[in-house]
């Protein structure tokens, strides 16, 4: 329930002109209250004016938007375009306003990007857009005299692609005086060359970087990864994501005569020097028989591990089942591996070791069939902490799903299930794993009936708290959604370049 203070704040910020004319007469401790009220009601003019006059030393957006005694609603999942742009404009006004000398830290981290915006305008400013607005503001202010006499540290989760690379570089490496100093605890990179990636990381302050995501269209091989880790260094890094094929050997690298992967050994040693690293995602890298080489040197147990589609063999699964990381795992993705069919006892030993900590388990396209359901029920039953279970793309019938759902109801903390379209809904003889065209060609009416049956299973078990869904093409990714046009252009250019290279090769052969 909202407090009388907050109701009064809402009434006040609804009169934009009145607030702006009287900001100098408002007590400092009311600014946070008025800010949340203006953000909630999307009074962008008031939001900007509040930041322009901000009388406190710190402005931390996530702290101001989180639940409090005056207003219990959490607004951190509102990446409202109008309000966030107003915040940045207000910071710029603050810098240029004479007499404004208290603000030292502006923290824009902690905003959660979601699929459906609850703000009145319904328009989101995602991580890439926020990066662009911040970089543009920094560039516009460079060279301006700073009335405060000291730069304002602006903390932000940066998302850098080819589309905003030049602007971000200029913001991070100003040529002259800069009233805003960008601090980057988290960085996501996409559609960059290896050289561009190294450049932006060097400027972003890798010594303070906590999370690094290098994804999709950053074409790295093992030589690049080794260079990245040895030359840049990330002593504070807690989370690392590497792109597809990041552990492939460089094209000019001759295989070791004794079969050792010296580059991987070197990379693993560099990772072992990161004493705070607890999250590692290396999906779609070929790591057959190499998991022990990669993970055994790590000194700190991993909490998050993504090994989806890494072509793991029995040796790899055996190592995972017995290594020191497993008892600490909270999030595990082993999608794309035929685990239950090929290595059932080893895989279920792994689940047993992780049972007391595992919160999120993803087993998409693992060829789990009806004949495996009883084993899956036994394997999952000890996982008392499990909150999310995702198993899209597995050829399971409606009856098998009903049995599995009945067992999942027994997991007390489970809140979210992503289940596949039942195989009953596809034509006879459908081949798994399915391509994007095939996966969408199913009998919607049959699916609706089975999905309703599955929800009825939950209701009969008094588990209305469990949300179920079938996202055909995977869970919503706000970063991909926001930059889809740029990624499409990048892929088309890469395809064109490949065709040109192929054509030249044919001409040389002739």
UniProtKB/Swiss-Prot annotation:
InterPro entries: LRR_dom_sf (IPR032675), PRAME_domain (IPR050694). It comes from the Eukaryota. Keywords: Leucine-rich repeat, Repeat. LRR repeats lie at residues 100-137, 181-205, 234-273, 274-298, 299-330, 331-349, 355-382, 383-407. The keyword Repeat applies. The keyword Repeat applies. Belongs to the PRAME family. LRRC14 subfamily. This is Leucine-rich repeat-containing protein 14B. It comes from Mus musculus (Mouse). The gene is Lrrc14b.
